[in-house]
A protein has these predicted regions:
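ATP-binding/phosphotransfer module of carbohydrate and carboxylate kinases, centering on a glycine-rich
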Residues: 384-398, 402, 411-426
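Phosphate-binding glycine-rich/basic clefts of nucleotide- and phosphate-handling proteins
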Residues: 35-41, 61-71, 228-360
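Conserved phosphate-binding/catalytic loops in two-lobed NTP-binding clefts
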Residues: 183-191, 417-443
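Early-domain small/polar-rich strand-loop-helix modules and first-structured segments
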Residues: 1-118, 251-282
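Nucleotide/phosphate-binding catalytic cleft detector across ATP-hydrolyzing
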Residues: 1-22, 93-213, 234, 320-340, ...
Length: 450
């Protein structure tokens, strides 16, 4: 059996072909979309779980050493892994919210895969993370369809990371490929996510058109300018139809992070001062919520930084605010804060005001956010997205006949207006915002494997 597999920054999804019609496959109970999240007792549990419960072995000596270290660390902590210790999707989020202090929780590991400067052991660990998530999806699909899944087309962004170029992209794709192989896929093909989304839109065209696909996901924004229509449908070689690609690691997560920073971090000390009158360092308020930046997370949650936070607390003019920031450190609450901002962003698409409730276990903080405050907070990210749209048109040397917007963040009226202002007078259409990439990947899988 072959599938299209969208290993997304925010959600994972899979689809099959039923004749000429792609169909999403339920992968989390009756849901077609599973949040790209994982929870475990410890970081080391991921590698050991793959080996003990799924019989997935490391592919090289680096992975073997990682596994040995993981087993030793868990033994020292007295942790014996049982079958439900590793959970995914909504279950992972629920477990984290129940016990943030004693839960290792990861959201959107795809955001880290192209980061430059990773050590071999870090790359091997990310491969284990991705392998665990892919194995879970594969098992869910096989249980649902009662068939083995051996062939897969996996979506990938134009650029995985803002820096690193081809080297970054190759690193990320290699991690995905190795993880998929270890998960049990035999034949693996990659396709650009905006191209896949475009294939789904192309199936509705009755005449040839030049289409600008704008795919705004959780972690990346990708634009592809493509000639599409009846004369291209079903062709395995689309190189002549691809006019331009632009992409950057900015997406819905960045909107949420910026909104968190601008509107939710003041009760934790942002903008406050030490007794000498100097403002608190901005990085202490950015790093805990930069959930798509592995280095920022590592720096904030380091033991050395806890000493720095306690020092700032002693010198603070408003020590009660720094005490809250220390609680963010101790209870790993960065993800929770960003989630609150995400909920506010969604609500403010339809409301002029939203009241956020931050549950810090010891207290509940309530903050009102106005829509214009939200728009101001995401302005810089919005401008970068608009630039990718204009760059694709310039690179392609022609204006599109139509703009097709897709991706989980593309339903935002604010972002749709941004694209319309960049290319006025050109019709803008939307499809299945969450499912277009996945169903397009299934269409490409049929071309590759049927």
């Amino acid at each position: 059996m072959f599938i299209g597999f969208d290993y997304g920054t925010s959600n994972c999804a899979a689809a099959e072909m039923n004749g000429d019609t792609p169909q999403l496959i339920a992968i989390e109970n009756d849901n077609f979309y599973m949040p790209s999240t994982l929870a475990a007792p410890t970081r080391e549990s991921v590698s050991e779980y793959l080996f003990r419960h799924w019989n997935i072995t490391p592919k090289d000596q680096i992975g073997e050493q990682l596994l040995r270290n993981a087993i030793a660390a868990n033994r020292e902590e007295g942790i014996e892994l049982v079958s439900d210790d590793l959970v995914f999707g909504q279950k992972a989020l629920s477990r984290y919210l129940e016990d943030p202090q004693d839960t290792y929780y990861v959201k959107s590991p795809k955001s880290f895969l192209g980061a430059m400067g990773l050590r071999d052991a870090q790359i091997s660990f990310f491969e284990d993370l991705v392998c665990a998530m892919m194995t879970n999806i594969k098992k869910q699909v096989e249980a649902s369809k009662q068939q083995l899944v051996e062939d897969v087309v996996i979506g990938r962004p134009i650029n995985f990371h803002g820096r690193g170029g081809d080297k970054s992209n190759q690193q990320a794709e290699t991690i995905l490929f190795n993880a998929a192989k270890r998960a049990g896929f035999h034949n693996i093909v990659f396709q650009f996510e905006p191209v896949a989304a475009g294939l789904e839109y192309e199936s509705t065209l009755t005449e040839n058109k030049t289409v600008l696909i704008v795919d705004i996901g959780g972690g990346t924004t990708d634009c592809s300018l493509i000639n599409m229509g009846p004369s291209w449908q079903g062709k395995s070689d689309r190189s002549d139809s691809l006019l331009a690609h632009t992409g950057q690691r900015i997406g819905g997560n960045d909107l949420d992070i910026n909104l968190t920073f601008k509107q939710l971090m003041h009760p934790f000390g942002l903008g406050s001062k030490v007794t000498s009158g100097i403002e608190m360092p901005l990085t202490q308020f950015w790093n805990p919520i930069a959930i798509n930046d592995v280095q920022a997370q590592k720096e904030f949650y380091s033991r050395q930084n806890l000493l720095a936070l306690k020092s700032l607390h002693r010198d603070a003019q408003e020590p009660e605010k720094l005490a809250r920031l220390i609680q963010v450190y101790q209870d790993t609450l960065g993800y929770s804060l960003v989630r609150c901002a995400e909920e506010a962003k969604i609500a403010l698409s339809e409301q002029s005001e939203h009241r956020v409730k931050l549950n810090l276990l010891s207290e509940i903080i309530e903050i009102n956010i106005q829509r214009d405050q939200m728009v101001a907070a995401i302005e810089s990210t919005k401008d970068k997205m608009a630039k990718l749209v204009s760059e694709a048109v310039i690179q392609g040397g022609t204006k599109p006949d139509v703009i097709f917007m897709t991706g989980g963040s593309a339903s935002s009226p604010i972002l749709r207006q941004t694209v319309e202002q960049e290319l006025p007078g050109i019709p803008l259409v939307g499809g299945n915002y969450f499912g277009s990439v996945t169903t397009g990947l299934a269409r490409w899988a049929k071309i590759c494997f049927a």
